[in-house]
Each structure stands twice: as C-alpha cells, then as structure tokens.
C-alpha cells in the first residue's frame, strides 16, 4: 500500500501561475509590501496565517496515525520497527549534537555580541517573563510523561504529535500481531488514506493566503528596522544554518548519492510555505507524501518524519548555542570550558522538551539558560525583537534536516528506491511509476 497522490502526475508541467511555489512567492512579496507600507493593516492580517496553520494542524494527527498504523501493520517482522526507530534516533542524536557544537563554534569565531557591554540589571525583563515561565515546564521527566496521553482521544484533540505517534505505533504493532483477524481493520484504514491526503491537497490551496497573512503581520509588527541593531547576530545565524545545510548535510547527501540542493528544489513549494508561515509543521503532511513519492519506504517515512519533528531540530539547536553565547558576550559574562560543556549538555536535553510548543526556540533557550545560571536570562530581552526573524531560518533548517534524515535512514535500511529518487530530484516526476513500500523486512539489519 502506498500514499496516493491527489491526481496522476501531469504529462507536462502546469503553467507557472498555477504552481503552488509561485503562488506562495507572490503572496510573501505582497505580504511584505503591505506590512512595510501599511504596518497597522499588516498586523491585522495575523488571523489569516493563524487560520491556515490551524487548518494544517487539524489534519496532521490523522495523517500521522494512518501512515504509521498502515505501515507497521503491513510488516511481517515487527523487529523491523525497532530497527528503523533505533537507526533514526541514532541519526537524530548525532546531528542534533553536531548542530549544537556548530552554533557554539561560530559564536566563538564571529563573536556577534562582543563590544555591546550590556548591563543585565538595566534590561527590561517583563517582555521575556512569559517565556521563562513556560520554560519551567520543560523538564526531561515532564517531557517523557507527556508522551503518554491521558486518553486515546485526547492526543488527537490536542494535536500532540508525540502522543499520536505513541498511539499509532502501539496500535500498529497490536494490529500486526493479530494477523488475519486485523485484516478488515487494516483494509479500512488503508481506504481512509486516499480521502485524507485528498483533503491535504485541498487545504494546501490556501497556503498562499496563510503565507500572505503571516508575513504581513511579521513585517507590520516588528518592522525591517528592528533587524538593524542586531543584524550581525541574525546574519551569523542565517550563514551558519546555510553552511550546516550546504556543507554538513550536503556531504551526507553526497555520500548517499544525491544532492541536498536538488532535494531542496524538489521541496521548493514546501520550503516556501515554511518560510511564509514560520512553521515547519505547516508542511508536514506534504513532506510525508513527497518523500514516499521520491522512493523512501512508506514505513520509514511514517516513523522518521513525525519523530524528527520532535528529536531532529537542527536549526533550533544551532540557534540555542549561538544565542546563548551571544548573550554571554553582550553582557561580558565569562564562560569557562566547563560552563560551555554544561550549556551543551543542558541544551541537548531541553531541545527535546520543546516539541509542539509555540515559540519553541525561544522557550527552549529560556529553559537552557535557567539551568545554566552563569548566562543571565535577562539577556534574552536583547534578542526578543529579532527572534521572529530568526524563526523562519530555524523552521527551514529543521525541515530540510528532517527531509535529509528520511532519505538517509531509508538508504541505511536498504529501503530506498534510488531510481525513483533521482527521477524526482531531476524534476521528472511524470515518469515515476506508482510507489512501492520496499522495506526489506525479512533481511537482517545492515551496517
């Protein structure tokens, strides 16, 4: 069984004005113009962006549940589930840690906060107080307990990705364990996949409206001028994120036989949607569909993508250490090697506790600084004004990181159709045959 597309691939491309990525580009430009020249009107466009993100969040839980349950239930060897999950977590841990280290190295080399000579006692802490309060809930035990929903229904009502993932994995395993008795249920769930993904395609038609509203609000409320004073920090973050994707993830992609830039081109509509809404969740359903279409096993996609949205946040991790050291430099706070190692270890844990939290990057930073008292939490007031502009870059980097992870784990598992991948990345989707879930369940684990 495979995730169906809404319609067969056309023999020739649609006119550019009918393509989603072009419509989103136009919407972003128009939103930026409105926000810049009519900021009061721009701020009032916020409900458009919020409404679109809510529409997407509405469908995320069913997409994850159906994809994972049908993927696991169709397996004949359940140990495959554990093997794929273990490989995914190993990948996430390595590259998340690497992203934290990269952010720390760049902060030392570029020194974005040096020379500011800010006195933390003179900063207005009221603006960051709400974020600090939310950060108190981000403990490791609290995070682990939050994975288990109070009821089966509450996970879907709250839209908690990790809870839906937890239920889907357990239900998929249970369904596979009962054998033929579970076939009618499996067939029913497989039949539901088509209308659910058709609904995804319908909702995506509203993407330009959502992107327009979100960008108009951002520019209208914060203004491009707010970037000037902290342009060095923002520029350093964007450059670091680009180098992480182009160099580190680029090398990983090359070793796996494809180009990260071609992958980004293949996902251009989704990337523009993430840019416009500043939310990687807004493109989650489309990412799952397109990764399977590009030759990744349905079973791997169903496990890796939703899990990666909580455990593989490369952009957020780069931001955390870079921003923390920026605050230390700006406030003339000396950090020993021991302090920085402690900061790294705390950030590794706290970054996992922000899954599904609005403003996750800023809240996670508050949680990290609260545990590392050497860096003044009050210093967060310095970056509050430009955090919204760094949010887009965090989301884009997180999104690309999860797309790369899906391909890498699929290849590692021997479940990647390389011919389909190359056709998709070369823009020859019209030549693609229907996808087949090629997970080699009966084979022993590789590498």
Curated annotation (Swiss-Prot):
What does the entry give for GO biological process?
A: L-aspartate transmembrane transport
Which Gene3D superfamilies has this protein been placed in? Sodium:dicarboxylate symporter
This chain's protein is named C4-dicarboxylate transport protein
Q: Does the keyword Cell division apply?
A: no
Q: Which GO terms describe its cellular component?
A: plasma membrane
Q: Record keywords: Kinase included?
A: no
- Record lineage: Bacteria, Pseudomonadati, Pseudomonadota, Gammaproteobacteria, Lysobacterales
The alphabetized UniProt keywords are: Cell membrane, Membrane, Symport, Transmembrane, Transmembrane helix, Transport
List, alphabetically, the Pfam families matched: SDF (PF00375)
- UniProt-listed HAMAP family: C4_dicarb_transport (MF_01300)
């Amino acid at each position: 069984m495979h995730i169906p597309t809404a319609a067969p691939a056309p023999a020739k491309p649609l006119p550019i004005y009918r393509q989603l990525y072009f419509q989103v580009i136009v919407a972003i430009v128009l939103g930026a113009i409105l926000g810049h020249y009519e900021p009061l009107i721009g701020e009032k466009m916020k409900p458009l962006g919020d409404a679109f993100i809510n529409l997407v969040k509405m469908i995320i839980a069913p997409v994850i549940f159906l994809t994972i349950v049908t993927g696991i239930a169709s397996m004949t060897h359940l140990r495959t589930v554990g093997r794929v999950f273990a490989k995914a977590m190993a990948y996430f841990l390595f590259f998340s840690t690497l992203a934290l280290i990269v952010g720390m190295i760049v902060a030392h080399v570029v020194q974005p906060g040096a020379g500011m000579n800010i006195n933390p006692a003179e900063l207005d802490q009221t603006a960051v107080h709400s974020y600090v309060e939310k950060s108190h809930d981000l403990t490791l035990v609290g995070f682990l307990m939050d994975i288990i929903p109070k009821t089966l229904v509450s996970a879907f009502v709250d839209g908690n990705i990790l809870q839906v993932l937890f239920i889907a994995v357990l239900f998929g395993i249970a369904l596979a364990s009962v054998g033929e008795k579970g076939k009618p249920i499996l067939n029913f769930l497989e039949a539901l996949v088509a209308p659910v993904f058709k609904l995804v395609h319908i909702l995506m038609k509203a993407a330009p409206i959502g992107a327009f509203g979100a960008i108009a609000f951002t520019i209208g409320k914060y203004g491009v001028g707010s970037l000037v004073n902290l342009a060095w920090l923002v520029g350093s973050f964007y450059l670091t994120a680009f180098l992480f994707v182009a160099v580190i993830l680029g090398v990983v992609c090359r070793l796996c036989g494809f180009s990260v830039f071609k992958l980004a081109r293949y996902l251009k509509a989704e990337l523009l949607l993430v840019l416009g809404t500043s939310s990687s969740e807004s493109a989650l359903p489309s990412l799952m569909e397109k990764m399977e279409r590009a030759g990744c096993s349905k079973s791997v996609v169903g496990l890796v993508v939703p899990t990666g949205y909580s455990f593989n946040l490369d952009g957020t991790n780069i931001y955390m250490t870079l921003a923390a050291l920026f605050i230390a430099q700006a406030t003339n706070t000396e950090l020993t090697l021991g302090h920085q190692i402690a900061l790294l270890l705390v950030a590794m844990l706290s970054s996992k506790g922000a899954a599904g939290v609005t403003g996750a990057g800023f809240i996670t930073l508050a949680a990290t600084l609260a545990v590392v008292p050497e860096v003044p939490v009050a210093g967060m007031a310095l970056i509050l004004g430009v955090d919204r502009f760094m949010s887009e870059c965090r989301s884009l980097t997180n999104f690309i990181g999860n797309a790369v992870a899906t391909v890498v784990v699929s290849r590692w598992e021997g479940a990647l159709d390389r011919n389909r991948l190359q056709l998709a990345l070369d823009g020859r989707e019209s030549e693609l045959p229907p996808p087949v879930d090629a997970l080699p369940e009966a084979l022993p684990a590789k590498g």
